[in-house]
Amino acid sequence: MIRKPGQLIAVMLVNSLALVMVCRAQNGWTSSQVSSGGRDLNAVSFADSKRGWVAGDSGFLAYTEDGGSSWIERPLGIDRSINDIYFPTRERGFVLAGGSIFESSDGGHIWHEAHKFSPAEFDGATPELYSLRFNGKKRGWVVGSASRGDIVVNSIVAITRDSGETWQVLQVPTKQELIHIDFVDDRRGWIVGAGGAILHTDDAGETWVRQNSETNATLYHIDFRNEKQGWAVGERGTILRTEDGGQTWRSIVSPARSTLLSVQFVSEDDGWIVGRGGTILRSGDRGKTWLEQESGTKQNLYALFVDKKIGWAVGSRGLILKYQR
């Protein structure tokens, strides 16, 4: 159940310019297209207003150091889709692709495969990792699913206590596909996934219990501002809200019926959601009500990264939207 790090393959990356065409501005959102070869972008992460990363299908990975005016591709040498990119610090970053965790310690210039989960750990089923979080230098968690063909046969929740040197697969109270994880402090965290699954820990991810979401909709993303206040989004326009740490979840009326894929709050009041069909929603009252924003696109938006001044949304065929107050 505990594996040593996977084969270390240092990737000395050669810069290749990923050109950007700025198209239009709509209601504060500027649309551009990164030259991804038509590949979808599944993840976005920014260290500050200038330096950020996007990642997507067939191993596409690119970074910017000028606030998105230009992007430079950093090939990992893989053809698997990248599902998540996460920088817990400015220099230390992680990428998830298939059953592998890639790590960088120099701000994303050089990457190596730090760990690879094996089908043998899941009774021969193929692992796919979707979301990773660290809290401090040593303790981290990754979630996903194990499948045979197109059928998910088990969930994946794994923990590291030694900065990713080893990972232990945990037993959790669901076999559903698990898609996103969020921690609000060093002990309390939540996971969401298929079938309305919401899991919660209050012991730093050692054990997990299931919370009642009151829905069977697949939940794709969860965001907590503190130990009480959180939101989850999913298919068919599902928006859930809690004010008691997930002991109770309330369904919120959504102005969109499309699948919602990412939610993030920049303060206790101000939050954003993106989803399929170019959907962008915004709330200014702690997520009690939501208004649809004009995105200027009908393409799917798969991931979101926002702070108090700047926001980014990425999606189909290299689409990047930037919001600036």
Residue ranges and their predicted role:
Residues 10-20:
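Bacterial N-terminal signal peptides
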